[in-house]
Amino acid sequence: MGADRRQAGLFDLPTRLPHGLVYQPGFVTPEEETALLAAIAPLPFREAKFREYFAKRRVVHFHADEHAPSYDSGDADSFSSGPLPPFLSDLKHKVAAWVNVDPASFVHALVSEYRPGTPIGWHRDKPVYGIVIGISLAGFGRMRWRPYDGRFDRKDIVVLDLEPRSAYVMQGPIRWEWQHSMLATRMLRYSITFRTQASETATFRTQASETAR
């Protein structure tokens, strides 16, 4: 992705951060952000729910087609609002060009609304998905990572401030060997997350490691 600071986006990150995380400030322009927020406003948001628990954030899911895997088959939060609307399709192509993958590789998109005080607990995205790309809009977010195996000290936790209009990519070790969380937001914030479908190799490796634990 080149050595330019704005392009690589890694120079402000701790050197001990595992491979696989790329952070890009200014991924969308202020004008693009304004248009995205206007397009997001009328979406049919619902409160995020995992099993019997409701979260503070509200979400809208989109799947590539009716056969695409849901985020969690046991999650009432896995509803789909249909195919991608044009504004998300355009953004998907921009994201695909950035990470050099086929736009058709993305099988899931998630739009999330974080009202002030909204956190996300520690988790790792479901193994049915591979590369994860997130775009931040409107407000700042603080994202954290820690080793997934549970053997870590507080000093091992890595923190990254997500600026409005920035984007990040998680793939490789940081996708499969780390989990992440979001600290409670201080202001209204939106995020758009795109996910590819995991390869059979990646899914098998993840399932095998979980079985071994």
What label would you give each PLM region?
Residues 1-213:
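Non-heme Fe(II) oxygenase metal-center motifs and adjacent flexible, charged/small-residue loops
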